[in-house]
Amino acid sequence: MDAFKGAMSKTLEVFTFCNIILALASLVVAQCVYQIIYYRFFHPLRHYPGPFWASVTRLWGAYHFIKGDKLDLEWQAIKQYGPIIRTSPTMLLVADSTLMPAIYHRRDTKARFYLSEMFETSGSLVIRDPAKHAAHRRLISATYSMSNIKRMEPLLDKHILHFLEKLDSEYAQNAKPMDFSTWAAYLSYDTVTDLGFRNPLGFVDSASDVGGLIYQFRLGMLLFATSGYLYPLFRWLTTTWLKKWLIIRPEQALGFGVIMKRANEVLEERKRALTEGRIAKAVKGDASYDFLQAFMDTRTPEGEYLDNKTIRAEVFVILGAGADGFSSLSSAFIAEVLSRPAVYGRVMAEIKAAAIAGEFSQPVPLFTEITKNLPFFLACMQEIFRLHPTGATQLPREITPNDPELVLSGHKVPVGIEVTCNPWIINRDYNIYGDGAEVFNPDRWLGDPEKIKFYEKHSLTWGHGARFLMYFEVSICEETPETPKLESEIYGPVLGWKNVWLDLHKRRSWEQQ
């Protein structure tokens, strides 16, 4: 008996708290070593080069995304290793634009990075299944058509004029420097909420982020993308009691939850207003027919109206991705053009010539007038779209058994692997744009029409193939009239950028110059 007690005592001594912690730590270390050895020497992607830590853990991508240098590191890795690199244990990043049709084809499946399970109802941007995406696209694509958007030009003009008046009174007259990117976001959100549901929120009037929507959307994007990089962990967490905190719901007061709450309020207010007779139901062709009413009128092939969750998901897209894209393009144009005196001079000479010749409607030129009379300005816009795409992030697809065979660097890519391109990187393909691929050169978009078609074919700014971004026409119609009007009314100094501040001055009419 004493011998048994002695043996038990020695056994218990082994299982002390410190020893248990040490054993668990050893298991973790052993698992990490196993994972490194497997991913580096036995995984199907072992043949592809890339940053070491990216090849063995998804934490590399999440960490550098949060840090803000992931894009730069990937671009440098491509320059070092070649056009196909490994950026996660199961993902390849492709910088060869000629391979886009093989990656973004009609039957491609979005990778699990998109976390469609994070939303109660998946909007058009996160539907993974190609058949479901195609069916959804057929339902809502007419809403975003160019003809429908051009009909709303008077609304765009109204917001552009109010925006310029505000800049004049707040900054030009008082000789105060401004952060243009912030105000571009205000204009964008007011315009999009008016186009979307006739309810501008007053960002420009209040000179503030109304309801924190801009901040919350960008915070939501940070959380969404970080979770996407770590999708195995996120998907596991949704099987635990934490699920109710991870699924985006209007009740949440953080990130996308705030945007979803606002989308829900927009829909419910419209339904109440129609029921109570406070507004008349607009019909297609009316000046008051907006995106929201178009969604509410949309029917499925079975003749059913879209349910509230689906409509709310599309309003969410308008409030978030739709509004934020325009502000980034406007800021890029100002930065690129004002820092190049020769380019700026050509843009202004072109605008002045068209204005003096009476080619522009007043007070804001029409989209068609700009496309007809400002070829160099449009070339600048094309170059902005190329070098500063709104979605400068990965757009991964998952290889499935139904996909055509994909061979990269001489190796067949197996099922389950993720393959991605990045618009910022793909639009700098030296094989397409030559030695000046990283240089802002609007003249590349002038001249040979076949060359221009070639560039457009190999661009990823607005997506590719069956998932071409429907909202791009809204961004183009917002950006195109706003910039010439801004340049003709108010100007900033032509300079090399040292900070975000811009000094504005009221411009005299063209006839007085």
Swiss-Prot record:
Q: Which SUPFAM superfamilies match?
A: Cytochrome P450
Looking up Pfam families in the UniProt record yields: p450
Q: Which cofactor does it need?
A: heme
Where along the chain is heme bound?
Answer: 477
Q: Name one GO biological process term.
A: terpenoid biosynthetic process
- Pathway listed: Secondary metabolite biosynthesis; terpenoid biosynthesis
UniProt GO MF annotations: heme binding; iron ion binding; monooxygenase activity; oxidoreductase activity, acting on paired donors, with incorporation or reduction of molecular oxygen
Enumerate the catalysed reactions. Answer: quiannulatene + 3 reduced [NADPH--hemoprotein reductase] + 3 O2 = quiannulatate + 3 oxidized [NADPH--hemoprotein reductase] + 4 H2O + 4 H(+)
Keyword entries, A-Z: Glycoprotein, Heme, Iron, Membrane, Metal-binding, Monooxygenase, Oxidoreductase, Transmembrane, Transmembrane helix
Its membrane topology is listed as: Single-pass membrane protein
Enumerate the subcellular locations listed in this protein's record, separating them with semicolons: Membrane
**A GO CC annotation given for this chain:** membrane
EC number(s) given by UniProt? 1.-.-.-
Q: What is the top-level taxon of the source organism?
A: Eukaryota
Q: Check the record and name the InterPro entries matching this protein.
A: Cyt_P450, Cyt_P450_sf, Cytochrome_P450_monoxygenase
Question: Which residues carry attached sugars according to the database record?
Answer: 308
PANTHER family in the record: CYTOCHROME P450, P450, PUTATIVE (EUROFUNG)-RELATED
**UniProt similarity note:** Belongs to the cytochrome P450 family.
Function field: Cytochrome P450 monooxygenase; part of the gene cluster that mediates the biosynthesis of the pentacyclic sesterterpene quiannulatic acid. The first step of the pathway is performed by the sesterterpene synthase (QS) that possesses both prenyl transferase and terpene cyclase activity, converting isopentenyl diphosphate and dimethylallyl diphosphate into geranylfarnesyl diphosphate (GFPP) and further converting GFPP into quiannulatene via an unprecedented cyclization mode which involves three rounds of hydride shifts and two successive C-C bond migrations to construct the 5-6-5-5-5 fused ring.
Protein name, please? Answer: Quiannulatic acid synthase
Give the source species. Answer: Emericella variicolor (Aspergillus stellatus)
Q: Which gene encodes it?
A: Qnn-P450
